Structure formats: C-alpha cells, structure tokens
C-alpha cells in the first residue's frame, strides 16, 4: 500500500514538472513571436512613450509620387542661392522643423526635452516585469540602493556580433583614395554592437522564465518530501505528532485506503470525517481501531483528535506561533538571493536601455543638426556611420535631399526600427563649427552621448548671431560689393545695386517668412522686379548706369550655385539619387531665373520704347580695385551665413587667394569657365585642407565663402544671365511673333548650362585637392571637407 502511494505521488510530481516545462516553452515562444512580429510598431510606440521622437515637416501625402515630393521638398528648402542658410530655413510656417525663432535656427515647440532615460527605461521594464511592488520594496530595504553603481551596461550579454553592412564602406575601390581633412576621423567597424530595446526585453523575459522554472521545481520537491513524510508517519501508527510536524494546511490532508484517497478534511483542525472499512480513524487520537465514525460517543476519546491531556496551553500556542513566523521569515530570506539577482538583472537591462536610447537620440539629433547647418551632403551618410561605430549602434542610413532615413537594427532579434529625419537644409557656419566640435569629442570618447545630447540641444536653442533685419542690409552690401569685381560695374552702380539688393533681401527674409504662397514664387518675382527696375535705371540718359551689372549683381546671392555644387559633389561621390534630383532641380531653378529676367525686361520694353539694350558696361572699374571688393564680399557673405568673427581671417585669406587664381588664369584661358573654376577650387581646397590639418579648423566653413566668390565670376564670364534680353527685345518688336520663332532655344538654356559647367569645375578641383593633401588617406578620413 505504501509503495503504491509513493508511486502515485511521484507520478503527480513528474506531471507537475512536465506541465511547468510545457507552459514555459509556450510562453517563451508566444512572447518571442509576438515581439518579433510587432517589433517595428512596438518600438515606435515605445519611442513615443519615451519622448524619443523627431519632428518632421508636413507630409506631402497629396503628391502623386516620390519624385514629385523630392522636387517639392527641394523647392521648400530654399537652399539654392549663395545664402542657403537663410533662404527659407527660418520660415514661421515651418514650425515642425526644430525651429521656433525670430528667423533663427533654434529649438522649437516640438523639440524633445532632455529627460532622464533611466526612469523611462525603468517604466519600460515595469510594464514587463512580474515582480510585485511589495517584493521591490522588500528588496530595496535589503540594500539594493547600489543598483545604479553595481549594474554595468558594458556586460557582454547586451552585445551582439556586428552584421555585414558595416563593411560596405571598407571595400577596395576608388573610395580608398578619397582622403580628407581629419587625421582621426576614420573609425574601424566594431566587432560587437549593442543589442536593441526589444532584445533586452526578451532577455528580461528569459531571466524571469528561468527563475519561475527553478522556483517551481524547488516547491515541487519540497511538497513531495513533506507529503511522503506525513504518509510514512501515518503508516507507522504514531498516536501523537509534535507541533512542529503538524501539517500546515489542515484543509488538504490525504487519507489512504487501499492506495486511494478515502477522506478529505473539510472542517476545523482536529475533526476529520473518514469513510472505509479499515480507515485509520484516529490520526492524532488514542483509539487505533476506530471503525467508521470519528465521532463515537460510546468510546472515550475516540472522537477527539486532541484529548484533554494533549491540549496545548497558551504558552505552547504562543511558542508555536513564533516558530511558524520564524519559519516564514527563513523561507522569505531564502528567496531573497534569487529576487535580488533578478532585480540586479532588471537594473542592468534598465541601464542598458537608457544608454541605448541616449545613443540613438544623439545620432538622430546630430543628423538633424548637420542637415540644418550645411554639412557636406555627399558625406552625411559617412558621418552617421562613423558615429554609430563609435557608439556601438547597429545603424544603416540612406540620404535623400532634405531627408535622412535611419534604421537601427537589433542583431539579437533580427528586427529594426526605422526613423525619418526630415528638415529644411540650410547653412549656418558658426553652428556647423560647434556641431563639428561635439562630433569630434564624441567619436574620440572625450564626451558621452548624454553630454552630446545636451550640447546639441543647446546649439539648436541658440539664436542666430545676426537677426533678419541685419541680413537685409548685408544682402544689399554684398550685392554692391560683387558688382564691380564680377560684373564690371562702375562706382555709380554700387548705390543702385545696394538698393535693389536690399529689396531682394527684404523679399527673402521678410515677405517669404510671412506667406508660404509667396515663398514658392520668390525667385520668379525677385528676378522680374530686379530686371524691370534695372532696365529702368539703365535707360536713364547719360547716367552711366549699367543695366547688366546692376541686374546680375542684385541677383547674385540667389544664384543656384550652392545647390549645383552639392549636386555635382554627390554625383561624383556616387550618390546618384540625391545628386540627380538636386542637379535637375538646379536646372529648373535656373530656368525660373532666366524666365523672370526675360519677363521683367520685356515688360519695361513694352512700357518704354527707348529702353536700353546694353548688356556690358562701357566704363568698367579699374581691375586693381577689384581686389579690394573681394574681401569685402567675402566678409558680407560669411556674415549672412552666420559666421563668427573668429572665422573671418581664414575665410578672407582663402577667398582672396582663390580669386587671384581665377583672375590670372582667366587672362590666359579665354572662354574656358570650367577650367578656370577647377584651378581656383583646387587652390581653395588645398588651403582649406591645410588649415584644417595644421590649425585644426573646420575645412568646409573656411572654403564655402571662397566657393561663393567663384560662382558669380564664372557666370559673368559668359554673360549667360542676360541671354533672355534678346528674346525680350524681339517680343516687344513689331515682328515679335516671327522673331521669337528664329531665336535659338539654346539661349534659354545657356544660363543653366553655364552654372553646371562652373559647378563641375569646382567639384573636380575640390576632389583633386583632397587627393593632393591626403594621397594615401584611407584611414585618415577627415569627413568635414568638400
């Protein structure tokens, strides 16, 4: 009988173990499948709960396709002129762009406030942890206050092998010789990357499941031992059981009769109703042969489990209570190490998730800042890859004009989280210099990701150095300075150009900020007004006012030189999508300007029959005075693009050197715009790279004003901006209809073709200069160069 009972108990224990194992496997499989299937959506929801989200501009859902959205995005960027940083980057209607300023690139209402990601990560874990608040408080009382210091986020359990896409930029090809400025900019791919949030949560579930299995097996073994001991005591026929061996649960006492359960305790302790012919009627009594009824009035003491002589005194009861409470305390103390271990594991995962969110946030914020402040677009992806390598983040990046698609991978779960960083691209030389400083400190491990986030947010919140009304007058000043050296204007033309340039600046910085509808037609209206007024001033008799000089000088700062330069650099860097879209938009932009000039000149010619037709100036200024206007224009264009006064000396020196090369090479190579621009940009690139290597400056900010000096000079050498004047004269002529048909169609495209020639020459010269400074610079990659 006893042997059969033991077999039954062992079978039940094995059944309990098997059921626990099956439940464990099913719960783990269900949790893994549910998390892997909804990883991207859950990650985005977690990101929203942690305020890890990034402002985007209004989606162009009404546009028909991706290509049209790219064109419209470029149109709204306003980065086509020589002052792309303030074209329309500070528009008040674009409130979703990290900008909330008085025409300043600063942080905005949707900006992400700095928060303690440790608490946010703890909130994530609390939604998935199975610890009760009482257990957490008990563990905190046992000395878990040092969790933050003992938990290490560098545990290898949180690292995963790096996947293959990190090697995309290490192939043996032409990019190996693409050496650049910074001697420490290159970062080797990490051997291990940090796991994602989803992988950390799944690891938390695995720890909890293991703890559940261990606890269940421990409880099953203890219950098996207790039940066996009780049954053996019954078989031995003991009449009295000490208080410490009494069953704890009086409502679940098994009685065996022929190996089967014969009775169940239903009432208070001390009374048992049993059935059976040979039931052991007295478990704690004196009668050993009680037949049938436990309560038998005819036999003394047969109905009482505890007789009078076995009754416990009050002292015995108090002693028994103390023993029970002590036993419970020992049991809780035995569980403490396991719970403490689980809490430490959760603390490590919390710290890991917090640091992971901080690093991902830094990558996205730095990407936003680089796009806002004019980092070289053809190397944006490389900046982000180098940063993610240093931070041990598994990231992939795809750049489109005005948009960066970021994918954070989790190698442990084979899932990824996609973020879209979209903003208006501009140019801010001083803030770009500051962002570059933060970037250098982070990749050289001189600054953590959390400190980098604070610095980036501070830079985004800062106002521009110069307000819009100052930029309006600087616009007129730059227009006046560019007229003599680039377009051959006389002294009297400076005042007219200053007035007209200020009008263009007011249209750009004031009117475009007030109306979104007007900002879409700013270029056309500005060219119409400038052409109309320029021909009107040039038609004044004996005034020596040159129509061509004042018109081209007033429009010099909205020429699409910068955007064509970025497009040509992207195409040369094999960024086909971004380069093609940007180049095509620049051609259309040039046609807009040409159409506006033609229309404005035709309108005035229709109103006044004696309108001037002169394109070139008959009284040019002395060539030696031109060298005085180049540094003045450089200072003006640098201040418009928010350069600090400490950056001006290097900018002026490089710009003047480049113009000297342009001037003297133009004397020897007639009608060769692209070759002249290539020589000048080659010298500019060498000086900028040397400045960055020797004085540890930022090459791109030092070279951009010098590049802006080259664009008007190249345009003026062909007079292509006024190619529409012939069409305007023929439109208002008597035989206008027939004359227009004989006009060569190449005249309308000559301005765009000239711009492309100049930009191609500049891009070739810049790439050649980097090869000259860093002939073997694969692992000395300075990224912030043109």
Curated annotation (Swiss-Prot):
Lipid bilayer topology: Multi-pass membrane protein
Start-end of Low complexity biased regions: 29-42
Disulfide bond entries: none
The entry's keywords: Membrane, Transmembrane, Transmembrane helix
Segments passing through the bilayer: 469-489, 491-511, 521-541, 545-565, 584-604, 620-640, 645-665, 675-695, 697-717, 751-771
Basic and acidic residues bias: start-end ranges: 1-28
Cited InterPro entries: ThrE-like_N, ThrE/Ser_Exporter, ThrE_2
A Pfam family that the UniProt record links to this protein: ThrE
Segments of this protein annotated with the region Disordered: 1-65, 77-103
Gene Ontology molecular function: any one: transmembrane transporter activity
Location of the protein in the cell: Membrane
Gene Ontology cellular-component terms listed: membrane
Keyword Membrane among record annotations: yes
PANTHER family, per the entry: PHEROMONE-REGULATED MEMBRANE PROTEIN 10 (PTHR31082:SF4)
Family: Belongs to the ThrE exporter (TC 2.A.79) family.
Name the record gives this protein: Pheromone-regulated membrane protein 10
Organism, as annotated: Candida glabrata (strain ATCC 2001 / BCRC 20586 / JCM 3761 / NBRC 0622 / NRRL Y-65 / CBS 138)
């Amino acid at each position: 009988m006893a042997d059969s009972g033991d077999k039954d108990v062992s079978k039940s224990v094995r059944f309990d173990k098997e059921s626990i194992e099956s439940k464990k496997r099913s719960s783990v499989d269900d949790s893994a499948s549910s998390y892997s299937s909804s990883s991207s959506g859950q990650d985005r929801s977690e990101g929203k709960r942690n305020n890890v989200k990034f402002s985007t501009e209004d989606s162009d859902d009404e546009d028909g396709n991706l290509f049209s959205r790219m064109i419209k995005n470029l149109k709204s960027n306003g980065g086509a002129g020589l002052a792309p940083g303030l074209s329309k980057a500070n528009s008040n209607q674009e409130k979703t762009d990290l900008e909330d300023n008085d025409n300043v690139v600063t942080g905005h209402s949707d900006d992400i406030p700095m928060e303690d990601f440790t608490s946010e990560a703890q909130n994530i874990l609390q939604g998935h942890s199975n610890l009760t608040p009482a257990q957490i408080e008990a563990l905190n009382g046992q000395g878990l206050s040092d969790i933050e210091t003992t938990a290490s986020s560098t545990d290898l359990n949180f690292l995963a092998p790096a996947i293959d896409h990190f090697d995309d930029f290490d192939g043996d090809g032409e990019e190996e010789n693409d050496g650049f400025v910074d001697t420490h900019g290159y970062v080797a791919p990490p051997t291990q990357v940090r796991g994602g949030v989803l992988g950390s949560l799944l690891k938390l579930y695995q720890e909890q499941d293991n703890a559940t299995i261990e606890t269940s097996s421990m409880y099953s073994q203890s219950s098996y031992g207790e039940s066996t001991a009780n049954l053996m005591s019954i078989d031995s026929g003991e009449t009295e059981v000490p208080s410490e061996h009494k069953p704890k649960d009086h409502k679940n006492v098994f009685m065996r009769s022929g190996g089967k359960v014969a009775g169940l305790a239903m009432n208070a302790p001390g009374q048992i109703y049993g059935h059976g012919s040979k039931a052991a009627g007295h478990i704690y009594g004196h009668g050993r042969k009680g037949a049938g009824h436990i309560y038998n009035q005819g036999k003394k003491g047969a109905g009482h489990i505890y007789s009078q002589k076995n009754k416990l005194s009050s002292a015995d009861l108090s002693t028994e209570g103390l023993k029970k409470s002590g036993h419970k305390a020992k049991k809780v103390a035995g569980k403490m190490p396991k719970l403490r271990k689980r809490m430490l594991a959760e603390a490590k995962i919390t710290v890991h998730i917090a640091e992971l969110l901080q690093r991902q946030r830094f990558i996205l914020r730095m990407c936003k800042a680089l796009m806002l402040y004019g980092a070289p677009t053809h190397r944006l992806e490389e900046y982000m890859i180098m940063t993610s390598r240093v931070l041990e983040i598994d990231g992939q990046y795809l750049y489109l004009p005005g948009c960066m698609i970021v994918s954070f991978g989790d190698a442990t779960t084979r899932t990824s989280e996609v973020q879209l960083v979209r903003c208006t691209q501009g140019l801010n030389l001083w803030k770009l210099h500051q962002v570059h400083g933060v970037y250098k400190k982070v990749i050289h491990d001189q600054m953590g990701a959390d400190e980098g986030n604070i610095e980036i947010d501070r830079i985004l919140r800062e106002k521009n150095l110069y307000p819009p009304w100052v930029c309006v007058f600087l616009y007129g000043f730059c227009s006046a300075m560019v007229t003599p050296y680039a377009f051959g204007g006389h002294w009297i033309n400076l005042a007219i150009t200053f007035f007209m340039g200020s009008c263009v600046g007011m249209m750009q910085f004031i009117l475009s900020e007030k109306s979104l509808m007007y900002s879409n037609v700013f270029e056309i209206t500005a060219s119409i007004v400038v052409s109309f007024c320029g021909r009107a001033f040039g038609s004044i008799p004996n005034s020596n006012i040159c129509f061509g000089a004042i018109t081209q000088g007033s429009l010099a700062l909205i020429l699409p030189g910068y955007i064509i330069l970025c497009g040509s650099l992207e195409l040369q860097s094999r960024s086909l999508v971004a380069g093609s879209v940007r180049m095509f938009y620049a051609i259309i932009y040039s046609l807009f300007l040409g159409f506006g000039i033609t229309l404005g000149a035709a309108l005035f010619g229709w109103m006044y029959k004696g309108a001037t037709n002169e394109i070139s100036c008959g009284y040019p200024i002395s060539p030696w005075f031109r060298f005085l206007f180049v540094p003045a224009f450089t200072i003006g264009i640098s201040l418009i693009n928010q350069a600090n006064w400490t950056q001006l000396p290097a900018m002026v020196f490089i710009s003047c050197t480049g113009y000297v090369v342009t001037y003297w090479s133009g004397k020897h190579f007639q009608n060769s715009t692209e070759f002249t621009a290539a020589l000048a940009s080659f010298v500019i690139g060498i000086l900028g790279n040397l400045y960055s290597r020797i004085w540890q400056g930022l090459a791109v900010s030092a070279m951009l004003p010098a590049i802006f000096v080259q664009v008007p000079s190249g345009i003026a050498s062909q007079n292509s901006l006024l190619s529409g004047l012939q069409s305007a004269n023929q439109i208002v002529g008597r035989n206008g209809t027939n004359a227009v048909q004989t006009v060569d169609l190449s005249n309308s495209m000559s301005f765009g073709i000239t711009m492309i020639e100049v930009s191609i020459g500049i891009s070739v010269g810049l790439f050649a200069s980097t090869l000259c400074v860093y002939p073997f610079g694969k692992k000395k990659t300075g990224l912030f160069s043109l």
